[in-house]
């Protein structure tokens, strides 16, 4: 690379395959003004960019970026799409991307709830084995045990609800 923030290496600038660079940028969802970053990088080695070739490649790359499958995959990573897709498909892609972000959020919440359930179950098992009863009376132990049972039940229900919601999204989008 030319510098720590250069978008292209010296060799990429000298090769000058602007259509291929544009395709890569389009497939990554980069906007039209991204070419200015390449201009800056390549001007340091005395190379001018070719806007027409780059934009032609970018438009082809956008066909890969602006798909329902890709919109959902981006959302499943917890990310929003860059607003570079044609206006006629943008609302649908934004909805699908939002569903992907919901999947991401539900998955994170499921992981948290599963960790919580494990913790409750370990506490409950210790109580049953009387390994670490730090309560002063048997009634306190029973009350604590009942509270844990209720937390386990509630957490299990939340986990089941999250799993159902995730399964519904998986059915809708096929994965």
Regions found by a protein language model. Give the residues of each.
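C-terminal motif of bacterial Sec signal peptides marking the signal peptidase cleavage site
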Residues: 2-4
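Intrinsic-disorder/low-complexity detector
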Residues: 6-175
């Amino acid at each position: 690379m030319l510098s720590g923030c250069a978008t292209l290496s010296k060799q990429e600038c000298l090769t000058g395959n602007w259509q291929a660079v544009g395709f890569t940028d389009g497939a990554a969802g980069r906007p039209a003004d991204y070419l200015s970053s390449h201009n800056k990088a390549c001007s340091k080695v005395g190379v001018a960019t070719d806007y027409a070739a780059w934009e032609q490649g970018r438009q082809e790359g956008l066909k890969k970026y602006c798909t329902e499958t890709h919109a959902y995959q981006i959302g499943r990573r917890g990310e929003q799409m860059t607003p570079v897709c044609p206006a006629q498909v943008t609302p649908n892609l934004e909805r699908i991307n939002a569903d992907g972000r919901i999947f991401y959020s539900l998955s994170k919440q499921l992981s948290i709830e599963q960790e919580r359930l494990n913790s409750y179950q370990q506490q409950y098992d210790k109580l049953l084995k009387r390994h670490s009863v730090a309560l002063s009376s048997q009634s306190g132990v029973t009350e604590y045990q009942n509270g844990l049972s209720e937390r386990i039940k509630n957490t299990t229900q939340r986990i089941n609800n999250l799993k159902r919601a995730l399964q519904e999204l998986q059915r809708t989008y096929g994965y």
